[in-house]
Amino acid sequence: PLTFEDVMNVIDLEQPEGVIVALGGQTAIGLASLLSQAGVRIFGSSSGSIELAEDRQLFEKAMEEIQIPMPKGKGVFDVASALAVAKEITYPVLVRPSFVLGGRMMHLVYDEESLKQKVEEALHLDSRYPVLIDKYILGQECEVDAICDGSDVFIPGIMEHIERTGVHSGDSMSVYPPYSLKDEVIATIVEQTRKIGLKLQMIGLYNIQFIIDANKQVYVIEVNPRSSRTVPFLAKATGLPIANLATKVMLGYSLKQLGYVGLYPNRKRWYVKSPTFSFSKISGMDVVLSPEMKSTGEAIGYDYSLNRALYKSLRASGVRVSNYGTVLATIADADKQAALPLIKRFYDLGFNIEATKGTALFLKENGIKTRIKKKISEGSDEILESIKKGYVTYVINTASERDSLMDGKIIRRAAIDNNVAVFTCLDTVLVLLNVLEEMTMRISLIDEE
């Protein structure tokens, strides 16, 4: 691991004029304060600016001063305070420790019992820092990578996530340029990005994640005062040398000198980033998407057609895309109405539909011919046998009730072990269907402009 002592040993040996921490991820910027105290010059955002972005109370105060909305929430140091905050802002809430990477131990909870358990786990991880309790807002998520020189801001691009809030940004499919955001929402995001960069006195790269709710209200989830994992994707999509530009800014160049200010114009092609997972190599790991990041890589697909770009990205990430076969559906009660039109589209495409009893009866009531499969918890292994023998093309599983969690986990694991595509988020299923309905098209070559 990157430690202060190791870095200081290199600095003592090399005697550099200064160091850049913003390109080294969360661990690197975590060393900024110690390095500054040791007299090391930090190129880019100062340790004070980094702290302003990272410290919950300081950041909330800064956002309030520039009138930028955030989801309601608070940091707590005990379970009783967590329960009080959750009662005030109402469930569901997001629970996460401070200063963690990849959404580690971040959970979406719906009741007091789950909240107690998750807060205790987070406090056990590190009781020196508060556990953050935030109101969960269901909405469209997007993120921005930007460069600030202290006076101006340059935004290479805005990326819109396929999956709605509740899935970690690193596990979401991401599209550039945005495919559904209205002009007024984009204008708000650009203005908020500018105001945040100047308020926090960012020098170089920073990343902001936003939520857009059903009323088109834009909220800031968090600001990362560093280069994000999305920079390589955005650099590829825009053709801009983003890291190079940011480094020049950190070394003292102004954005106006470099000729880049404001929002960079969108390119004509669509670029889609899909996460890649290593579930088949990590035995026992659950594949369900959640606020905690599980992906280990990413793939890109691009084309002048959005659906073709989505197809290429899915295929590049290892998803077997087939326009015939059998869909196995086990859907939570809360998701049944949203899943119905999606399952209907599979049925209309000619897929066989199989489901556990509750889901099957619901689908039959709505005119979809469905074969009932017994649950594993009922002592049957017919679902597992069907998956193992290659009869199932796709598994759609959104089960979240406690009594069906174990069934769902076993089904998801069996699918992964037998190279069957698993979808735990209906937003991703919608993308797959859009692709399947265009499967007869000729896929264009990945060419250069």
What are these regions (language model features)?
Residues 337-435:
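Feature captures the catalytic cores and cofactor-binding loops of soluble hydro-lyases/lyases
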Residues 36, 45-106, 366-375, 427-441:
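A conserved helix-loop-beta module that forms one wall/lid of the active-site cleft
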Residues 17-54, 69-74, 346, 417-429:
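A short, GP-enriched loop/loop-strand-helix hinge that lies immediately N-terminal to
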Residues 1-18, 26-29, 41-44, 66, ...:
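ATP-dependent carboxylate activation and anion-phosphoryl transfer catalytic cores
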